[in-house]
Amino acid sequence: MLLSLVYINCDYLQAQTTIPRFEEGERVVFVGNSITHGGHYHSFIWLYYMTRFPDKPITIMNAGIGGESAWDMKDRLDYDVFNRKPTYVTLTFGMNDTGYDIYMKDNAKELSEQRIAKSLESYREIEERLLAKNKIKTVSYTHLTLPTKLEV
């Protein structure tokens, strides 16, 4: 009985969650760091669409660069993202933003706070610039949560 209720409840929740699909001709740019650059998730998304909707081709573009931070991505939005004329943009950042490489330095707390502030400023500017582009229908962000209080 309990399993039946769980199944019914999950089925109900699944029916309530509809993820819109990309339509024919959509242009999706995946922006990020090495996780995007070397990852294969964008290829899996393309393969999913090509095998299920072969009559509605989409374009998937990888704009990931290893070692990038949010401020690097912000600086290349015009020539590496907007020039591709995307209808969707997804961003993955955060791994290189918080200063994991500076924790052993004497002034680690100060350096980390500076990098966190720079990252937050970059996130805001990226958001503003993407939202100003009316032709980009959806903007998706994925980033690591920054600490609200830094303990070193």
Residue ranges, per PLM feature:
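Conserved SGNH/GDSL esterase-like catalytic core that processes O-acyl groups on lipids
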Residues: T17-R124
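Residue-level signal for alpha-helix termini/capping positions
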Residues: F82, L131-A132
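A short helix->loop->beta-strand "cap" motif at the edges of active sites that frequently abuts
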Residues: K133-K137
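Short beta-strand segments at enzyme active-site cores
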Residues: T90-T92, T138-Y141
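Conserved small/polar residues in nucleotide/adenosyl-binding loops
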Residues: T142-T148
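Bacterial Sec-dependent N-terminal signal peptides
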Residues: M1-Q16
